[in-house]
A protein has these predicted regions:
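Short amphipathic beta-strand/extended segments with alternating polar/hydrophobic composition
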Residues: 36-42
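Glycine-/small-residue-rich active-site loops that bind phosphorylated ligands and cofactors
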Residues: 36, 182, 205
Length: 223
């Protein structure tokens, strides 16, 4: 059994404990003892960014919900133009600090990219106050609509969140959501708000049989 050393930890107001742990060159973030992300399994997060940016019309304003280990943010920055603005909303300020202090080397320090803007706070609030502000919104804050890191994130995947995401997207904008597994109810909910939805199953990592699910929901073009 691997022995993981706790490098940093943080406790949120709701009592949730976030732990950054390391074993040799492996890093994980745990929430309440459950692994939320690992630097040894991030290919599907990168696929989320690549597919979302490819579906959008030359996106210049992108919102990434959840910083984590930085892989989704790095993949977005690698795909967008030099004059794009990429905002990353992260609820846990310690995660931002850990990326600066420990994790940036894993992804070539994406927080130092001049196109990157960091908002410390709930991504739902950022979406809610940003009508027609983004060409692409990526949500990688949980293990999917059913496996939540925090209970209040349910609003992101329910009517309030889907409605807010639709309103925050520009014409032909793309909402891209990472999930550990399929969710027919969420698929139908996206369609009920007028999104054109594509669901992709992608490898959790290169060579793995494990699959993760990407929801790619596109807003209809408008005048």
């Amino acid at each position: 059994m691997l022995t993981w050393a706790t490098v940093e930890s943080a406790r949120l107001a709701d009592g949730s404990e976030f732990v950054l742990a390391r074993h040799d060159d492996g890093w994980v973030i745990r929430v309440n003892s459950r692994i939320l992300m690992s630097n040894r399994m991030h290919d599907s997060e990168e696929a989320l960014a690549e597919h979302a940016i490819a579906r959008a019309d030359d996106p210049r304003a992108v919102l990434v919900g959840g910083l984590g280990l930085g892989y989704t943010l790095r993949a977005v920055l690698d795909e967008v133009a030099e004059d794009a603005i990429v905002t990353v909303a992260e609820l846990v300020p310690e995660l931002v600090a850990w990326n600066h202090k420990h994790l940036g080397v894993l992804t070539d320090h994406p927080l130092d990219d001049p196109r990157c803007r960091v908002v410390v706070g709930d991504v739902f609030d950022t979406i809610k106050r940003s009508p027609r502000a983004f060409d692409v919104i990526l949500l990688d804050v949980d293990n999917g609509p059913q496996a939540l890191a925090q209970a209040k994130n349910q609003r992101l995947y329910g009517d309030p969140g889907v409605r807010a995401c639709h309103a925050a997207l520009r014409s032909n904008g793309v909402l891209a959501v990472w999930s550990a597994g399929p969710n027919a109810r969420y698929h139908k909910k996206l369609e009920s708000f007028g999104f054109d939805v594509q669901v992709l199953r992608v490898a959790a990592r290169v060579g793995s049989r494990a699959r993760h699910v990407l929801f790619l929901a596109q807003r209809a073009p408008t005048d």
